[in-house]
């Protein structure tokens, strides 16, 4: 078991510089969202003496280093206010769909849209006995299994095509955001977008000409269904699997949507944004 390490302020500052340079070169509207982990809110449930890293100061320092013209989402503040609800999985190292929805409301406003209110959605549990990496490591039944949820907009149903470009440059296509086969695997969280891939292009029935580039890690995946309600096309670039961006003419806005730890991976940002 590896002890949690403090976030590198130097690495966060270097990543902020790279994002600032990308903004200066593209002059596109950009929003940055750093997602804190669950330990920030539930440390009182840890055994005595168990170490954890408080991420709030590092997120503040990171945001302060980002250009004032780039919009930032205070996901920490939003999730702290919702911390009595089911916003993080118990057995997966990710937030839940409800956690993602809570932050989506702020993200989409910063991108110029009105968020879809919660009462417009029907929530379905597509898997009620999901067990993630924490369960796989401990094999203990003391922790309740997780719920994998789908939010469907009753007033404006969404249809999507997802075109995935794999590492070997081959492509596959499906007529849904969701990969139902993943529900039967050891990582049912991959239901939301499927296995990580360098590029996924989401094409929707929202015929408004709006196109978004999302630079992401796996934490972003369960927010994409909410974002897709507002865009005709979304380009999803996985920071851990891609070093190439779509042509700048293909999108009008950029969203950085990653777990806070991911923003310390300066080399990955440099490879993607400065080559």
Language model segments and positions:
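Extracellular glycan-modifying ectodomains
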Residues: 1-275
């Amino acid at each position: 078991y590896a002890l949690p390490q403090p976030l590198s302020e130097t690495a966060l500052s270097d990543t902020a510089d790279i994002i600032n340079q990308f903004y200066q070169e593209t002059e596109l509207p950009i929003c940055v969202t750093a997602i804190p982990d669950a330990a920030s809110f539930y440390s009182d449930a840890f055994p005595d003496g168990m170490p954890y890293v408080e991420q709030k100061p590092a997120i503040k320092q990171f945001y302060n280093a980002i250009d004032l013209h780039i919009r930032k989402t205070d996901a920490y503040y939003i999730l702290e206010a919702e911390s009595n609800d089911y916003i993080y999985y118990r057995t997966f190292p990710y937030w839940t769909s409800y956690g993602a929805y809570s932050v989506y409301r702020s993200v989409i406003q910063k991108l110029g849209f009105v968020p879809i209110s919660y009462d417009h959605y029907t929530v379905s549990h597509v898997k009620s006995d999901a067990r993630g990496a924490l369960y796989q490591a401990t094999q203990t039944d003391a922790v309740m299994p997780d719920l994998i949820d789908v939010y469907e907009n009753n007033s404006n149903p969404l249809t999507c095509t997802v075109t995935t470009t794999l590492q070997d440059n081959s492509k596959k296509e499906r007529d849904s955001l969701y990969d139902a086969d993943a529900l039967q695997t050891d990582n049912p969280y991959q239901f939301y977008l499927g296995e990580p891939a360098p590029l996924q292009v989401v094409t929707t029935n929202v015929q408004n000409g709006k196109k978004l580039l999302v630079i992401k890690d796996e934490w972003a995946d369960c927010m994409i269904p909410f974002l897709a309600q507002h865009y005709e096309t979304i380009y999803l670039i996985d920071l851990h699997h891609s070093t190439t961006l779509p042509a700048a003419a293909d999108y009008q806005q950029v969203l950085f949507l990653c777990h806070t730890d991911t923003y310390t991976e300066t080399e990955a940002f440099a490879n993607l944004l400065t080559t």
